[in-house]
């Protein structure tokens, strides 16, 4: 039976690839169904012989307990946005300062969810959400139900690839029709529907909703020397790659493509929100490098946002964790980009003055970055009142005098004991990108603060289960889960804590770079600002901000209290080893290694202080080669770069 099951699995997987990836089926639907039913019958009779890559895994129901956290071996960066031709020109000018004659590749920006797929020996072992770029959620079982994701590859490869999982418009319409018939609320748009589907704990629901993917990058060190060749390689491996793309030599060609896509956008079978422009040559990408947040070799052009008219009803003023007071407009409800919008940001007091926004004005509302509702401008022809908006002079939270500094656009409360600032700081500390304390959201934080159970972040770690039971609506099971989540967060790597402290200008990426270098928050506390400023991709602004924060007596007390409660202050990721054998060297891995997995070789190189990259350039110091090294070895020899083999790496 095992032989027949092997034959059926191989046949059905091949037919599925022909249907979903190549759009060129070689058998009829009825023949596929007949073979599929035969396989199901055999697997039911011999469950111990079910193969890991059986297509029945895609439809079988399984109720999951939850989603485990998963550390990305290769971090996922955000892209810099561009909203105009002028911003694209500026991007091109920056690139040409480093790369004489760049060729660009333009790809559609799919409005879906970023995913990372890891294969070991050609078998799918992990499917993970983007998360914060460093840590995502393991949704492997759900992604196995996405029919165009290969469960196995035609080669026994160790490879990690990235892409977007989305819901086609036709599937979206079908899903909402079913929800309407069942009396359930409809999804606002395909992206929300895809996100909700991938968060399902019942995998059978995922299988029914017909999600799809486009893959766009080999995340593990690339085996090809350009983005275009990389995409073709992904197609060879059986992944679905979006065919709508071009190579361009200048911004004129890019702009023409953007205009063409904009005209076709509404007729596509899936949602897009822009065009991604990348330098095609991977060696040139390597030369350009990264900022703290984004690659310097790519930009995401975003299409102009949909705009609607709404009437301004009133303005709320709220205080953030840094003391900035932000105005939010209450509006007559309007439908915007698939959702109902009744509130929109007015940004700051200077923006209100610049746009001359007045009481009862009719305003144009849009979604900034297709996400945040914002007021764009006033429709002056529909103005009904000359009365200006009331600008507060006192903090809406603590009643302290508000200040409007000369070099700032916003009003600011500088009271360090302002309740709103403290509470927002606590919410930030517990958030996903910071300490990621599951369940400790704004509602619970507000109740804890109101009950005087927490006054600063150290108090969170003094809470006991019984404290949560004092809060309205919290039962024993929830209290136990909250307590467990707080205790678990003590073990986080220290960059999560550093970001959670909410130090001005110190974001999540900067926190990671700082801890990679200094290894612990205590070492960072002792460091001088010159050393901080010298770290690549950081600089003087972050150094000064850290110096100011650590100079306060309160910061020293807080760190001591956090340590006393058992919170980890050490970095648990791959550190930068200053005196290691390969410290500061840029190394490329290429070819097929005989004894080490590529991931093992990469980890060893990094543990020795090397920066491992995917392409050979003039910035490369060393190339480690295996069998069939190909063009990268040839380029290294042409550039006179030192070449070593696997045995040399093992000897270190």
Curated annotation (Swiss-Prot):
One of its GO terms (molecular function) is DNA ligase (NAD+) activity. It comes from the Bacteria. Keywords: DNA damage, DNA repair, DNA replication, Ligase, Magnesium, Manganese, Metal-binding, NAD, Zinc. The active site is at 109 (n6-amp-lysine intermediate). NCBIfam families: dnlj (TIGR00575), PRK07956.1 (NF005932). Belongs to the NAD-dependent DNA ligase family. LigA subfamily. This is DNA ligase. The gene is ligA.
